[in-house]
């Protein structure tokens, strides 16, 4: 996969940084992680399956492979649980992930600049579900970065099954490892900001890698309460660790203004429902999901007593 990335990246402005990214990624893949043999064995088994062409048939990223052995494929893919982002369909096997990513995609795609021929970065890409959608939408190259190693192997598993591979890649890197060069036309940061101890640093790091007039799509948890500027959870939020700050819409707009982004627009605010986030048999033995994270007596509150999750999507330009 890294050799393919080199081949495609060198035909774009990412030529300036691709060798550095490959060296960093190689180092991560060579780390001593006891799960890697299991993950690599799963991918080895997946490679014995027939491949198919990739397209998007709502809600699924669909791989139209024929004569798939559903039993062995499902068994191999479940060696890579939990599957958070998706859903995917391979032949007639439906990989119903915890999140219905298509719902978020449909909320934002009509409003952003066309991705055709763009160099696109997907920060915190997970297994690459959205990164694939960016590539299908015509990106010259769509690069996801995801430091959690398992999700990189999930990406490779899906990639193994595709015979019309678009220019899409996921590397096991965090945003701070991307050189501060203005190379990306469009940058997505979705579900990342609230996990940052330093939101200003994150916004500035995003800006550093964007071309002049490049577009940022920022999706994050917010607080939608009158006269409340932000909430800093002590402990967990909706049973999530490392949630550092939930801003109001106006506070988030101010943060973007302070970072000197321009043309700031709020596209959408949506309360997360169990239609979009739910437990499935693809998330493993820990079958808790949104309904378990909310107060059973008041679904407008989390189990900790905070307002239930709402997510906002902003777009802006450098």
UniProtKB/Swiss-Prot annotation:
Name of the top EC class for this enzyme: transferase
Protein keywords: Transferase, tRNA processing
UniProt-annotated binding residues for carboxy-S-adenosyl-L-methionine: 85, 99, 104, 124, 175-176, 190, 194, 311
InterPro entries: CmoB (IPR010017), Mo5U34_MeTrfas-like (IPR027555), SAM-dependent_MTases_sf (IPR029063)
Biological function: Catalyzes carboxymethyl transfer from carboxy-S-adenosyl-L-methionine (Cx-SAM) to 5-hydroxyuridine (ho5U) to form 5-carboxymethoxyuridine (cmo5U) at position 34 in tRNAs.
Family: Belongs to the class I-like SAM-binding methyltransferase superfamily. CmoB family.
Subunit composition and interactions: Homotetramer.
Name of the protein in question: tRNA U34 carboxymethyltransferase
Species the sequence originates in: Ruthia magnifica subsp. Calyptogena magnifica
Upper lineage: Bacteria, Pseudomonadati, Pseudomonadota, Gammaproteobacteria, Candidatus Pseudothioglobaceae
